[in-house]
Every structure is written in structure tokens, then in C-alpha cells.
A protein has these predicted regions:
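Secreted/extracellular ectodomain signature
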Residues: 14-108, 120, 132, 142
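C-terminal catalytic histidine-bearing segment of alpha/beta-hydrolase fold enzymes
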Residues: 274-320
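Alpha/beta-hydrolase active-site loop
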Residues: 162-181
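The feature captures the conserved acid-bearing segment of alpha/beta-hydrolase catalytic domains
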Residues: 216-280
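Conserved alpha/beta-hydrolase
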Residues: 145-162
């Protein structure tokens, strides 16, 4: 309780909230964008998080509807993404956007501080599905503890994925540029194709401090593969090429239709041989499928321990 009180005291945005709303607000800050925090006429706080879109309008619409249904009252927007409205119209409160860093672009409607003001930079890389524009997909919530700690949030968006080596090299080049600009720490995070390219950028010498790779894949679903050994061999090459230095978190779920099998064993063996000391989250109970890291349940359970390991090397349950 002392730690919670200290956290709340350090958060001006929650200073005027009641105890129930403060607790909801602390939860809200640790979930991914697009997200909205609202107050009902009853004084309670309500949240909606993890919505896709080029801007937060969809999250706002769905969040207000949900809030009004649950509170049975009119609801007021308090915070959109990380922008405290303080009575302003959300569009009028749109924060200025920082310039792109190579092929990295700022998360839309997100207040970033820039390399001199931020504690670091976390870069989200989305998955990919043929015919679907994933450039407006929501970052998974494990990015949020880093933004709470003062990191800026950028994205590595690819409408089409046709050049894997080129994408990995471009991401590595952008990390070098970010460090040259003054970002003290850079963390790469991604799911599926994004998880794969995050690891691949590391093998190309990207000066990263940490990598969070969830359900890494880029060969499609197993049912469509003619030879699963090719996909597994490429995975083995990736994990063998990672050198000690950055803190690595790899996550895999049961029932992943993109998983050829044995990949976490491959990762452990490769990292043991190279001296990398990772966190491997393999088949966590209660999570199933390629997209099990989406939504709010995974970051609520694992977000804090992933962040703690990347930042300090400490292993806290359930990451230990």
C-alpha cells in the first residue's frame, strides 16, 4: 500500500480522483494504446484499451459506450492514450508528433518527449497477415510499463513484408540513429512477424538494450508449409546469431498455428551455448494461440516482470 500511495502521489493526473478511480487509472496506464480512461457520474473510473486505428476515435467511441452502459450514467473523457484532457476536446488536445527516425514513426496521438527528455525509446513492430493493413494495429500492452517509466513510443510499420533482410537492416539502422540522437536506451518489441524482425535486427548489430519477442513467426501457418524443417532451421539460425548484451525475452503459447514445435527448446540451447541469459516464457497457463498476447490479460500478468527484467535483469514471478 505504501508503494501504491507513492505511485499515486507522483501522478498528477490521478491526484483528484477517488480511490476506486485511482486504482483503475493505474491499471489503465499499464495497458496498450489506443486507450481511454473515463469517469462516470458515480465518480468511478472506467477504461478501454488496446484498440486499433489510425487515431483513438474508435477507442473513444467504444469506451464511452461501454462506460455509459456499465455506470448507467453519462461519462466524461479524462485521458486519451497518455494525454490528460483536463476538460479539453480530445482533438484539440492532439499532441505534436516527433519526426520519424528512419523507418520508425511515432505512435499516433501519443505525447513523446524526444531523446533528451525521455528515459528511452521502445519500438513496437506488428504482425502481418496478407490483405490486412496492420499499420493501424494496436501495440500489445507490454509496451506500457516502459512508457510509464518515461520511454517514448514509436512503431516499425510495414504494409507489405517482402524483404525480410532489408526490414531487419532498416530497423537496426534506425536504432543506431536513435542512439545517435541521444536516446539512452532502446528496446525492440513485437509480435509474430514483428517479434521475428526484432530478433533479426539484433543479429545485425542493432545497439539495443532489450528485445521482447512474442510468438515470433514469418513462414505462415504450419498447415500451409510443405516442409516445416525450413522454418525451424531459420529460427535456429536467428537465435544462434544473438550475442550476449541486450536482455532478451521470448514468448511462445500453446496452440500457436504458426509454431512448428521445439522453438523454445532451440532458443534455450542456443542461448546457453552463446552465453545469452534470457527470459523464456513458454506455454504459460491460461494463454492459447498465436494472438494470446493481444488484449489486456497478458500484459496485466507479465508486463511488470518483463519490464523489470529488461531494465534491471531482475527476475520476478511469473517471469522467473
Amino acid at each position: 500500500m505504501v508503494a501504491l500511495a507513492a505511485t499515486l502521489a507522483a501522478s498528477p493526473a490521478s491526484a483528484q480522483l477517488g480511490a476506486d478511480a485511482q486504482r483503475t487509472y493505474e491499471d489503465f496506464k499499464r495497458l496498450g494504446p489506443h486507450r481511454v480512461f473515463m469517469l462516470g457520474a458515480d465518480g468511478k473510473g472506467y477504461l478501454w484499451a488496446g484498440a486499433a486505428g489510425a487515431d483513438p476515435s474508435g477507442a473513444i467511441e467504444r469506451g464511452l459506450k461501454d462506460c455509459e452502459q456499465r455506470s448507467k450514467s453519462t461519462c466524461t473523457l479524462h485521458t486519451v492514450n497518455n494525454v490528460v484532457l483536463a476538460g479539453r476536446d480530445w482533438k484539440a488536445a492532439t499532441p505534436p508528433s516527433l519526426p520519424n527516425i528512419g523507418r520508425l514513426r511515432p505512435e499516433p496521438y501519443w505525447e513523446n518527449k524526444g531523446p533528451q527528455g525521455a528515459a528511452g525509446l521502445i519500438v513496437w513492430s506488428h504482425g502481418y497477415m496478407l490483405g490486412v493493413d496492420a499499420t493501424v494495429s494496436a501495440p500489445q500492452g507490454q509496451v506500457a510499463p516502459f512508457t510509464v517509466a518515461g520511454y517514448d513510443l514509436f512503431r516499425f510499420d510495414r504494409q507489405y513484408i517482402r524483404d525480410w533482410p532489408g526490414d531487419a537492416t532498416a530497423r537496426a539502422d534506425a536504432v543506431r540513429q536513435a542512439k545517435a540522437m541521444g536516446y539512452r536506451r532502446v528496446v525492440l518489441a513485437g509480435q509474430s512477424a514483428g517479434g521475428w524482425v526484432s530478433l533479426a535486427a539484433t543479429t545485425r548489430g542493432a545497439p539495443v538494450d532489450g528485445v521482447i519477442s512474442v510468438s515470433a513467426a514469418h513462414h505462415g501457418e504450419v498447415k500451409d508449409m510443405r516442409d516445416v524443417s525450413f522454418a525451424r532451421s531459420e529460427w535456429q539460425q536467428i537465435v544462434k546469431a544473438i550475442k550476449p548484451g541486450p536482455r532478451i525475452v521470448v514468448v511462445n503459447f500453446d496452440g500457436d498455428s504458426y509454431d512448428v514445435g521445439g522453438r523454445m527448446d532451440d532458443a534455450r540451447a542456443a542461448f546457453a551455448a552463446s552465453g545469452v541469459d534470457p527470459v523464456v516464457i513458454s506455454s504459460p497457463e491460461g494463454f492459447k494461440g498465436h494472438g494470446a498476447g493481444n488484449g489486456n490479460t497478458f500484459p496485466r500478468k507479465f508486463g511488470a516482470c518483463i519490464h523489470g527484467f529488461i531494465e534491471t535483469g531482475a527476475r520476478q514471478p511469473p517471469c522467473s
